[in-house]
């Protein structure tokens, strides 16, 4: 079985003084998250699409799905967690309430505020996760990356050709991800907030899938302006 987990737990503090969490803001006349859900519905192999959102916004999300005629039977809205990984675990728990997981079940996790993912990205995530167990979507780093231990002086300049910027989706064999997460101590859970990093720290392989520069995460007013420019350019979905 193939599941999608759309992570819509953020409140959008970096977006400034806005009336709604960032995932519900309008992008070309339609909420950002609706664009994202539509992209997932275009990939026909999902058995279930689960949206994790703050408790007080669940009914709002359900109303949006109804208003945009996306009340598909495969879509479910649940309460998100305190952080990203907690939300993913809530999604997995939701799946387990009605299905016994097997070793090959896969979950494609994705930021609700990345509405420009493509069918190609989803397809390759699923294919490689089936083969390797875990996948991260990345793009090559364009700028030179500088590291600093004190925010005052350079402590290192990594080789740019070895640097990538992480995007989403991140895709996993569900049982492997859950078992890895549950093996962590509480302090490790607080530090390892990225699901792929959990597997890397445990010495497990994570396959790279090529993302797209336009697969941006909308977290600031500038990002929203860029997103509006992208969408008016009619970016293809494949």
UniProtKB/Swiss-Prot annotation:
Pathway: Cell wall biogenesis; poly(ribitol phosphate) teichoic acid biosynthesis
The keyword Plastid is annotated on this UniProt entry: no
Keywords: Cell wall biogenesis/degradation, Nucleotidyltransferase, Teichoic acid biosynthesis, Transferase
MF-aspect GO terms: 2-C-methyl-D-erythritol 4-phosphate cytidylyltransferase activity; D-ribitol-5-phosphate cytidylyltransferase activity
This protein's record includes keyword Kinase: no
Pfam family, one: IspD
Catalytic activity: D-ribitol 5-phosphate + CTP + H(+) = CDP-L-ribitol + diphosphate
Xref: PROSITE patterns: ISPD
Signal peptide: none
Catalytic class of the enzyme: transferase
An example Gene Ontology biological process: isoprenoid biosynthetic process
Domain of life: Bacteria
UniProt record similarity statement: Belongs to the IspD/TarI cytidylyltransferase family. TarI subfamily.
PANTHER family: 2-C-METHYL-D-ERYTHRITOL 4-PHOSPHATE CYTIDYLYLTRANSFERASE, CHLOROPLASTIC, RIBITOL-5-PHOSPHATE CYTIDYLYLTRANSFERASE
Listed name of the protein: Ribitol-5-phosphate cytidylyltransferase
Native species: Staphylococcus epidermidis (strain ATCC 12228 / FDA PCI 1200)
